[in-house]
Structures are given as C-alpha cells and as structure tokens.
Amino acid sequence: MFSGSIPALVTPFRDGAFDAPTFARLVDWQVKEGTSALVPCGTTGESPTLSFDEHYRVIDCCIEAAAGRVPVIAGCGSNDTATAIRHMRHAQASGADAALIVAPYYNRPSQEGMIAHFKALADASDLPIVVYNVPGRTVADISAETMCKLAEIPTVVAVKDASGDLARVTVHRKGARHGFCQLSGNDELWLPHAVMGGAGCISVTANVAPRLCADFAAACAAGEWTRALALHDRLFDLHKAMFSDTSPGPVKYALSRVHDWFSPEVRLPIIPASGASRAVVDAALASAGVI
C-alpha cells in the first residue's frame, strides 16, 4: 500500500508554539522533492509534547498542505487504547490515508495484550493501520510471530520495523499475508531491508534530503542495486548524524542549515543539538552534497 521515501516529519515550533505556515511550507517542499507519503505526529514530530489540540492541528495542516498529492499516514499511537482510538477517529475524519500506531509503551503489555490493543483499534475505526515496532523506545517488542498474527487483521496493512533485526523482514514476508507492506524504521538499514523485500522507509533523513532519499528508493524499487549502494554510501554519514544527539535535535538543526526559514527549536525535555552534534551534522550535510 505504501512505498518509497516517507519522512517522519519534524514539527516546527516558533516561540513555543506550533508554526503552521512553516510546516505547510515543509510539506510542500517534501512533495515537490519526490517524497512518496508523509508521517506527521510521529516520534520525530515530538508527538509526546503535543497537546491533543496541537496534535490534531498538525495532522490537519499536513493533510491540507499535501492536498491529495501524496498519502498522509497520521501518527495516532498511544499506550492508552482509548486515546489511540480518539486520535484515529480524528485522523480519519480529517482525511488521513492511514494511521501509524506505535506499540504501547511504558506499561509493557504482553504479546496477547498487544494483539488485543490492535484488534480494538481495528474494531473502532476502518482507517488502515501501519504498526510501528520500536522496542528501543517502547521496551515492549512486537515479536515477528505476533506481527504475522496482526497482519491477519484486514485493516493492518503495513509494519514500520525499527527493531534493527533484519531477519524479521524474511519472517514477516514468509508468515504474513500476501501483499503485507514492510517499511524500514532505520535509515541506515534501508538498503538491506529493501533487498530482503521491504517496500520503503519511514525516514528521519528524508526530512533533510528528500530528493536523495527518493532517488535511493527509486533505485531500490527498480532493482538497480549498484546505484542504490552508491546512494546509500552517500547518505550513510547523514543517517548516522541524525542521531548524533537526542532526536529530533540534530535533524531540526540540519533543516535550519538547509532552509533559512526553518527554526531548530525543540520542546523540553528535548534540548537543541549540542555543538559536537552540530559539527557532525554540518560535515555530513557537506559530504552528502546537501549543502
């Protein structure tokens, strides 16, 4: 259902408030640069710091700015099932194409609990669901076996896997229903993920280098692996630089270097990228030819 380069969009702030005009400008630039779909209100979008009203404004602004040119996969996850349902219902009413649902974090549900969570979401809304597995943040890990069971739910259409376990790509491909979409959640693993059957990546780096990431995705889709490897190598330092300090500090700083209209402002408890991180980002932007 989804493929290619899909940025997990940053949320721009100015003087502490959501900067809607800048966000709309960012979305328009992304689409024009070849981005395949958009994810507002994910981790990179600092969703834990957004009020419900802000969360919905970000989703609505993204849908309005995208104007039907590319799909919008709205971040709707929560460790409270009722809250996730509320987010999904708003996203669907606003015209989102799918919901990104992170594994319930902090309260550490069992595998059976996670299945029950996603079934409850599917029962409450027919909005397509992209399951997001990122055990490094959530602690709870959706096992490959559980993921294959979740894929039996008709509206669970894809997984964003950021476990770092590439073997899961094969397990999912062999065990999930035909056509189930696999998206990488790790930029630096996008190439091997694609070789093993992945359709694309929900990317941090694509915030900053959307054209390069779109070109890389196109090379993978065409099976042009020599070209894909060359682009992977060109982007690799930038992939790593995006996590040279706590995300999204580095990617917001990088965007401020690419566009003078973008502010690197973040919200507590995230703080701006350190001097050392900024130096790493500057070097990576230069080596990739982004600046």
UniProtKB/Swiss-Prot annotation:
Pyruvate binds at residues 44, 202. It comes from the Bacteria. The record marks 43, 106 as: Part of a proton relay during catalysis. Its EC number is 4.3.3.7. PROSITE patterns: DHDPS_1, DHDPS_2. InterPro entries: Aldolase_TIM (IPR013785), DapA (IPR005263), DapA-like (IPR002220), Schiff_base-form_aldolases_AS (IPR020625), Schiff_base-form_aldolases_CS (IPR020624). Pathway: Amino-acid biosynthesis; L-lysine biosynthesis via DAP pathway; (S)-tetrahydrodipicolinate from L-aspartate: step 3/4. It catalyses: L-aspartate 4-semialdehyde + pyruvate = (2S,4S)-4-hydroxy-2,3,4,5-tetrahydrodipicolinate + H2O + H(+). Disulfide bonds: none annotated. One of its GO terms (molecular function) is 4-hydroxy-tetrahydrodipicolinate synthase activity. The keyword Amino-acid biosynthesis applies. One of its GO terms (cellular component) is cytosol. Homotetramer; dimer of dimers. This is 4-hydroxy-tetrahydrodipicolinate synthase. It comes from Sphingopyxis alaskensis (strain DSM 13593 / LMG 18877 / RB2256).
